[in-house]
Swiss-Prot record:
One of its GO terms (biological process) is magnesium ion transport. One of its GO terms (cellular component) is membrane. It comes from Oryza sativa subsp. japonica (Rice). It is found in: Membrane. GO terms for molecular function: magnesium ion transmembrane transporter activity. This is Putative magnesium transporter MRS2-H. InterPro entries: MRS2-like.
Length: 435
């Protein structure tokens, strides 16, 4: 039943009620019915993702840790596309960090980031942050802890110093709270990407040192057991130890070759300084905003070309990076020499064991030769006795049976013994028998 309008009176409402109850009013009402609002369109059916797509997406996502230069840290579960947008790297450079692909250790320098792939350390370093792949892995945890402990203590940089120097005091003049020594100390601090590279190489070298120390202790114990008892079990342990040393040597050699390649390539070394462009832009902005105050740094190539003094000159960056890589190159070379020493110790022990085995084999050959000579003498005596022991009947046999038999056996035995002595004498003079 239709309700009366709000602006009608009570009588009109009653008339409207009575009118609505008649059949004519029903027909009129059906004719003059106000059309209803159109229904909203149906939502398109949701796209159902199949199990295969969900599994593929879950397989492509990996755990990353983002750490900025201020010490801010967070865990991110993302795929390669997010990392590519975040770091500005192409997809082909991200394949280097894939653990499924067997790639040699590499340090790639790109326009906006540096890709570090050194054994278990897989990271992307930009001018302001570092992305570490699989930070919760057992071998990566020392590297992650080193980063988290270091960067909160090293959050002061030149930009903060310059900003603090331009704060005004109550009198409206520039504050001089920061001394020149503090500015110089901030300037001498390593760039962010160099510090991350330093920690990565340090973590890899510490892992190598720990591994070679464990292998050295294992080698001493295994080789001592081998010298006491040459058994199949001890020989298998030595073979396993040599295989581990070979794998470790190949790994150290690859990292050493990569560091040596960067040291020899000046262009690649220059491209590793990813923070210089960002710092150069910040210094340009600070110089425009505060032209009265500039940091006292001389011998800058950018200053000579543009008249703007920057934080760290490019020559100084290249020199610092060269010293850093050269130090780790020497350390890797020392680790490789330690591996060579352990391998040489194993080889020397194997040579000693081989000499002992050869001696045992010679003794066995001498014993075999002795048995052959003795068997030859016995065989001759047996052959002669068998040849003259035919059972031929003779009428005078019972008279002469005891006379020639003893002499014949004695003469035959003496002859065979003489042959054996002659053979032993020949073998002794020709050193065919061991002393």
């Amino acid at each position: 039943m239709a309700l009366p309008c709000a602006f009608l009176s009570a009588a009109a409402a009653a008339n409207a009620t009575s009118f609505s109850s008649s059949p004519e009013s029903r027909r009129c009402r059906s004719v003059h019915r106000v059309p209803s609002r159109p229904r909203p369109p149906l939502a398109p059916p949701a796209r159902v993702m199949g199990k295969g797509n969900s599994k593929r997406k879950a397989a492509n996502t990996r755990l990353w840790m983002r750490l900025d230069r201020r010490g801010g840290c967070e865990m991110i579960l993302c795929d390669k596309s997010f990392v590519a947008r975040r770091s500005g790297l192409p997809a082909r450079d991200l394949r280097v960090l894939s653990p499924l692909l067997s790639r040699s250790p590499s340090i790639l320098a790109r326009e906006k980031a540096m890709v570090i792939n050194l054994e278990f350390v897989r990271a992307i370093v930009t001018a302001d942050e570092v992305l570490v792949l699989e930070p919760l892995a057992q071998e990566v945890l020392p590297f992650v802890e080193k980063l988290r402990k270091h960067f909160p203590l090293k959050s002061l940089d030149v930009d903060d110093v310059s900003t603090h120097m331009h704060t005004e005091n109550q009198d409206g003049e520039l504050a001089q709270d920061v001394s020149c020594y503090e500015v110089e100390g901030a300037n001498h601090e390593l760039p962010f990407e160099f510090q991350v590279l330093d920690f990565a190489l340090e973590a890899v070298c510490l892992s190598y040192n720990s591994t070679i120390s464990d292998l050295n202790r294992s080698a001493i114990a295994v080789l001592d057991d081998l010298m006491k008892s040459v058994s199949t079990r001890n020989l298998e342990r030595v073979w396993s130890l040599k295989s581990s040393l070979t794998r470790l040597l190949a790994s150290v050699q690859k990292v050493r070759d990569e560091v040596e390649h960067i040291l020899d390539d000046n262009e690649a070394m220059a491209h590793l300084c990813t923070a210089r462009k960002t710092k150069g832009q910040k210094d340009l902005l600070n110089t425009i905003l505060f032209p009265e105050t500039r940091l006292c740094r001389t011998h800058s190539s950018i200053e000579n070309s543009t008249g703007i003094r920057t934080c760290v000159p490019s020559d100084s960056d290249a020199h610092i990076l060269d010293m850093l890589l050269e130090a780790y190159f020497k350390q890797l070379d020392g680790i490789r020499n330690r591996i060579f020493l352990v391998r040489q110790y194993i080889v020397d022990t194997e040579d000693y064991i081989s000499i002992q085995l050869d001696n045992k084999r010679n003794e066995l050959l001498g014993l075999q030769l002795t048995l052959i000579i003795a068997s030859f003498g016995i065989a001759i005596n047996t052959f002669i006795a068998a040849a003259f022991a035919m059972n031929i009947p003779h009428r005078g046999y019972h008279f002469v049976i005891g006379v020639p038999f003893g002499q014949f056996v004695g003469a035959t035995s003496f002859l065979c013994m003489s042959i054996v002595i002659l053979l032993f004498t020949y073998a002794w003079r020709n050193r065919l028998l061991c002393t």
